[in-house]
Amino acid sequence: MYLNLYEIKIPYRVKRLYYFNKENDPKEFARNLSRVNNIRFNDSKDLVWLEIPDIDFKITPQQAEKYKIEKNEIIGEKEDSDLFVKTIYRYIKKKFIDNNFYYKRGNNYISINDKFPLDSNTNVNAHLTYKIKLYKINERYYISVLPKFTFLSDKPALESPIKSTYLFNIKSGKTFPYISGLNGVLKIDLGENGIKEVLFPENYYFNFTSKEAEKFGFSKEIHNIYKEKIFSGYKKIKQSLYFLEDIININNYNLTMDKKIYVNIEYEFKKGISRNIKDVFKYSFYKNDQKIKIAFFFSSKKQIYEIQRSLKMLFQNKNSIFYQTIYEMGFSKVIFLREPKTNSSAFMYNPETFEISNKDFFENLEGNIMAIIILDKFLGNIDSLIQKFPENLILQPILKEKLEKIQPYIIKSYVYKMGNFIPECQPYVIRNLKDKNKTLYIGIDLSHDNYLKKSNLAISAVNNFGDIIYLNKYKNLELNEKMNLDIVEKEYIQILNEYYERNKNYPENIIVLRDGRYLEDIEIIKNILNIENIKYSLIEVNKSVNINSCEDLKEWIIKLSDNNFIYYPKTYFNQKGVEIKIIENNTDYNNEKILEQVYSLTRVVHPTPYVNYRLPYPLQVVNKVALTELEWKLYIPYMK
């Protein structure tokens, strides 16, 4: 089996070449050389210099070589690894631009020639694109080349009949929000620097995201392109990227079987064990026997009339999919709440303000109450609805049009989701984690809003059954790529207190999962974790992994080194890995046993029996909480 890794074959050194031109200003001289050679030249008061890999290299134009002076330097990778990595990236960028590729931020290279128009909209072209990333594995450097597609307008922005939210500048590689293109004048949004009229509009093309593909009706075709043509992107690497042969071995990285790990995930239900989560309908919830209370909320009597046939088929017919699923999952009884005065099972809400009738009635009720809210239209922002409904209700909004033609698997998913939100219910137990009841898993996400110049910190704690022990979020912190460790310490103490209150003792092991890298002082973090002398492990989780293969890796884990792994979750869409790096491990588990637990956390909770989470559950929780204000409450079963 092969991975898209190509070993760097040149010496791990950087060569610094110096140039002196007494007839030219150094800044201007450096700028001209950078433009002509497609690589950055630096300047000082009197000198210009270039940093390149330690290979034979001649600058353009040839006569400029006469300005080269004898002074040069060789800097080894061990002396300055950051310089070596930056230099490799810059040289790769030059080679791509020299060979008819656009550069796009994030080390993406868009083929100018390898493109084709979409069948569903010929004004949009799919360009074969390669994303490049360097990896250091067991002291050797590799370039990872990941094929993908970029969707650009066929013509420059001012000539394009189709427009999108963002413009891509083919010269700078940057994207900008599109403002207008009237009377031959193209305007873009520069954020804090305001709106600008561009000087060279021919350099700007519309860039279409997956969301815009939905808007314009070609999202299905994009999915098919990835499904049917991404394989050819891998096959073209050797032929298309021949120009990189001077620095890399263009043969793929051969993955030996001892580097492949398979974790057998088994679900234990009440009446059986299976590797398939869908067998929950066959074997019933691991723990249930709960009554389920349901309240229906409608926007108007007209709405009730329009969907009454669908409601009767679903909720009055005892042989319906709804009742069948209720009993399959082990619920003991269904109770439809009624309005106290009228005895009606229809409760009303205002579709404009989302105020509900009988709010006091619901606030005084105890137990698990599912609120099925029928919506007339899609709500772009559902926070207002969540704010107005009592906090003790478990909200299940559904569009009226979907209820009228609802599929059986959707009904089953709704019932399953209800069980997920009831604390007394346990759909299943992951057998790999069943004996880890004294281990606590903490997820941390630090996200940034560069426009507002603020950071948000979210932290969760989850046990081996997927129960959320603790969840909190800090909004609008001072923008910083590092976590505020005073907050982390305070939250850690809160988590331990919550755990102790539930279990009357502290956990024996804590595994801390960080979305991204630990940029903070690790020693301080270790001191925080040592408060109660609990054994711990620190793990970095990178969800933007470039390493992949044209072969099927789903449900496999790749061992890159003793502490570095990539797992490929089972998904219905494109194969994409998640990198796990174990930074610190002072638990009694070895690294592979830690990895097994982390991977099992992707299955410890399923949002529906038809969907897997891609990230370990503690991070899935904080990612959702960090990205939304209140909407996460519809998906994350945490009622505090």
Swiss-Prot record:
Keywords: DNA-binding, Endonuclease, Hydrolase, Manganese, Metal-binding, Nuclease, RNA-binding. Residues 210-291 are annotated as: Linker L2. Residues 101-153 are annotated as: Linker L1. Its EC number is 3.1.24.-, 3.1.26.-. Has 4 domains (N-terminal, PAZ, Mid and PIWI). The N-terminal and PAZ domains are joined by linker L1, the PAZ and Mid domains are joined by linker L2. The domains assemble in 2 lobes; the PAZ lobe consists of the N-terminal, L1, PAZ and L2 domains, while the PIWI lobe has the Mid and PIWI domains. The PIWI domain assumes an RNase H fold and has the catalytic residues. gDNA lies between the 2 lobes, with its unpaired 5'-end anchored in the Mid lobe. It comes from Marinitoga hydrogenitolerans (strain DSM 16785 / JCM 12826 / AT1271). This is Protein argonaute. Its cofactor is Mn(2+). GO terms for molecular function: DNA binding; DNA endonuclease activity; metal ion binding; RNA binding; RNA endonuclease activity. Pfam families: Ago_MID_bact, MpAgo_N-like. Optimum temperature for all combinations of guide:target is 60-65 degrees Celsius, the RNA product is more stable at 60 than 65 degrees Celsius. InterPro entries: Ago_MID_bact, Ago_N_bact, Piwi, RNaseH-like_sf, RNaseH_sf. It is an enzyme of class 3 (hydrolase). Residues 154-209 are annotated as: PAZ domain. Residues 424-640 are annotated as: PIWI domain. The gene is ago. A highly versatile argonaute that uses 5'-phospho- and 5'-OH- guide RNA (gRNA) or DNA (gDNA) to cleave target RNA or ssDNA (tDNA) in all possible combinations; has no detectable activity in the absence of guide. Uses short guide sequences (18-21 nucleotides (nt) on average) to bind complementary target nucleic acids resulting in target cleavage in a site-specific manner. Belongs to the argonaute family. Long pAgo subfamily. Residues 292-423 are annotated as: Mid domain. Residues 1-100 are annotated as: N-terminal domain. Mn(2+) 1 binds at residues 445, 515. Unlike most prokaryotic argonautes, this is encoded in a CRISPR-cas locus.
